[in-house]
Amino acid sequence: MKRINILNEDTANKIAAGEVVERPASVVKELVENAIDANSKNILIEIEEGGSSLIRIIDDGDGIYKEDIEKAFLPHATSKIKESEDIYSINTLGFRGEALPSIASVARVNLKTKQETEECGYEITIEGGKFSEVTECGVNKGTIMEVRDLFFNVPARKKFLKTTSKESSLINDIITRIALSNPNISFKLFNNGKKIIHTYGNGNMKDVIRTIYGKSIVENVLYFEDTSDIATIYGYVGKEAIARGSRNNQSIFVNSRYIKNRSLGIAVEQAFKSFSTVSKFPFFILFIEIYPEYIDVNIHPTKSEVKFNDERFIFKKIFGAVHTSLKEEVFSTFSIPEEVNEAISKNTNLNIEEITFKIEEEQEKVKFNTNHLSQKNICSTQGNNSINKHIYDEKHKTDTNIPLNVNIPVDLKSDHIKLEDDNNSIPNKEVICDNNEVKYESSYTSDSNQYENSCKSDVDKESKSKTTGTSELVKEKIPKFPAIKIIGQYNKTYILGEYAGTLYMIDQHAAHEKIMFEKYLNDIICGDIIIQPLMIPTVIDLSMDDYSYFEENKDVFKEAGFTIEDFGGTSIALKEVPYFLGKLKPKNLFLEILDNLKNLGSGKTTEVKYNAIATKACKSAVKGNDSLDELEMVKLIEELRYIDDPFHCPHGRPTIIQFTSTDIDKKFRRIV
């Protein structure tokens, strides 16, 4: 083994500079952050030859005390902290005291500075770590820092620099990020005498976005915001029109510090994906303002990464804020005229009335007064070919005591529609529409009296116990788009409708899929999940990592309709699964949901998220090439109007698109 040597100060500084000063952009970042910490309002950056020959930073900040000028260039000298505990309450961008000595050890540096109370300024020159005397000079309040001939004494580092244009581009990028996080500061960047960036420091974030990215970008961004006890999440996310094939236009800031965090970026991308049909990455600018004690900024040499105490919590807050903003934007494009809204509001004070079952000798009649709906019917809405049959199959089994749930819209008027039957256990069922009354008939005989009485008892109890709560929920059910008039079906896949001169096309599969998807989530909220026992429990062997996530989310699986028991070690046994999802592969479903939880973090049961539920919902939804009659189409559209988000299927594909008369006239060149 070789002998141990103690490195001299010059060698140690050059090695340290390798971590902090990677390239000219690193120097610009450190010096501009120092200017921001000095309370500057105007910062000018000048570079030549990509920053390798000259970097000049001019600010109007507080300046440096004469006695501190030399100390500022000593290793670990800083005005930001005094003790190690101060790191966990830091509110400045710099704090280590490494940048200036690192830069001074590999470049020729000249510093001029003046405080407001001083009569003159002071100047010092450092070349390769060697100091000159501090002398008086004429200079305005603030600091001027010149860095020339970067890496002049470390040629091995200099040869690894990229081309001048590439290094200039990296400097441009870092100033862009810093300007976005400081809209109250005016930034000017000059490259070889040419102005590249100029922000005005008026505090208007959209003005900064317009200056940096252009008018087309600022016109296609949406604001989002969410707050909690420890953090505030806010920023802008781009619409689908400005999505790109790379993540270059994505910025994340924590307490005004530009960072890189893949997980938080995925939170925005997942929310964006719910409303996008393109395989591109969204434009976004994300700000996280959080109490310093909940993060650790001292985990990376360049401070470009931050560690959160609870990153899953931050992930969910970001996802929720972005998702809500995008959802509201979609809803605004399908607005209902004001006069229609007023008419709807006058008719939404529904009285909740008990559902009564009339038992006759040879038939069971379920009478629904469509002006008096129970909330359970609203929660259980379905649509299918045959839509009513799907509901019946799901809720009405001969070996269970589950009440029948059917929901037919008020405005359906048809004489006599027979539904095809491919289930021998439910013979001769049909729907009879008589004015505003809808009767569901079946050939169950008096042998079913026990079932009928059980249904009546269950519904009576539920009606009495939930009248108050459900009436409040019903009032919240409002249509998200107008009551369009059905005019036909195209290619057995798309439903055509019109309203006020606008043509609507609805993807029947995507629409029904979304209705089923929201029904499952609503069932979880209502505690109304129907489960099916497995004849043979499915045993799944999990890794230690997967098992820990399962343990953490046991309640999530339970409330979503899964009965799971430990099977020794890290193995589990699936005994019961949600009946709603029909025929499925329990193991695959469980692992899909578990993967979602690993990506999104644990949370409310309604966050047993999109992939697993949406994929399974697809399998029993109305398909393309399914012929629907007018009653079925009207029912499907009416149900779609009242769900929380009728405009996108769980995969993010649109369920409904619209064409105004102007759009169509342009296609036929009636107007230009």
Curated annotation (Swiss-Prot):
Residues 443-454 have a biased composition (Polar residues). It comes from Clostridium botulinum (strain Eklund 17B / Type B). CDD domains: HATPase_MutL-MLH-PMS-like, MutL_Trans. Gene3D superfamilies: 3.30.230.10, Histidine kinase-like ATPase, C-terminal domain, MutL, C-terminal domain, dimerisation subdomain, MutL, C-terminal domain, regulatory subdomain. Residues 455-465 have a biased composition (Basic and acidic residues). SMART domains: DNA_mis_repair, MutL_C. Pfam families: DNA_mis_repair (PF01119), HATPase_c_3 (PF13589), MutL_C (PF08676). PANTHER family: DNA MISMATCH REPAIR PROTEIN MLH, PMS, MUTL, DNA MISMATCH REPAIR PROTEIN MLH1. Keywords: DNA damage, DNA repair. GO terms for biological process: mismatch repair. Belongs to the DNA mismatch repair MutL/HexB family. One of its GO terms (cellular component) is mismatch repair complex. This protein is involved in the repair of mismatches in DNA. It is required for dam-dependent methyl-directed DNA mismatch repair. May act as a 'molecular matchmaker', a protein that promotes the formation of a stable complex between two or more DNA-binding proteins in an ATP-dependent manner without itself being part of a final effector complex. Residues 443-469 are annotated as: Disordered. This is DNA mismatch repair protein MutL. The keyword DNA repair applies. GO terms for molecular function: ATP binding; ATP hydrolysis activity; ATP-dependent DNA damage sensor activity; mismatched DNA binding.
